[in-house]
Amino acid sequence: KKSKEPIKTFAIGMSEDAIDLKYAKQVAEYIGSEHKEVFMTPDEVLESLETVIQLLGTYDITTIRASMGMYLVCKAIHEQTDIRVLLTGEISDELFGYKYTDFAPDATAFQEESQKRIRELHMYDVLRADRCISVNSLEARVPFGDIDFVKYVMSIDSELKLNKYGKGKYLLRHAFEEGDYLPEEILWREKAAFSDAVGHSMVDYLKEYAEGTYSDEEFESLCMKYAY
């Protein structure tokens, strides 16, 4: 919103039940960006599944689910634009809290979980972003991953990060209150997982595909053969 020229923004969702697209459009209109919506179809999701698992090198369910949308939106950016460097919001959850850390019993537990998630960045969210972006010949810039910023946030008393305000990630939201960067309803909107926000039907199609590919007996047998 403060830049001399409008930035280009992108959002992705299922063609039938995308949740986040309308909110992304609202933000784009508010900040005056050149906005592009990318719709993914059930066929595109299923056709990309093997590629996504291969490029991730993991069978972690949550990472794969979240990577489907990121892979396809990066693919669209590469094929449809000349943009090669992206700004992305990774690491804010690790620093300021996930939805489940709203229920941390105390500040020590919150801090320990945050430290653990940062140590394991390369295994989950950053793995997803790194592979999905780079495989499409793009580069990422991660403002929340700035080392000085990470050290600063991790030095803040974890008591202040606990959800005592009725909203998760309160400190991050509060930091954006001044400056008129975001619409008020977006700033205080409930957090949603990326893999849900693209549309619940995506997971339904993946489940249907898996259940139609393997019987319960075959699955149990393969679990014994491939322990990891």
Regions found by a protein language model. Give the residues of each.
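ATP-dependent adenylate-handling active sites, centered on carboxylate activation for C-N bond formation
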Residues: K1-D180, D196-Y209
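A short alpha-helix-loop-beta-strand transition element characteristic
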Residues: P183-E190
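Peripheral terminal appendages
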Residues: A192, A197-Y228
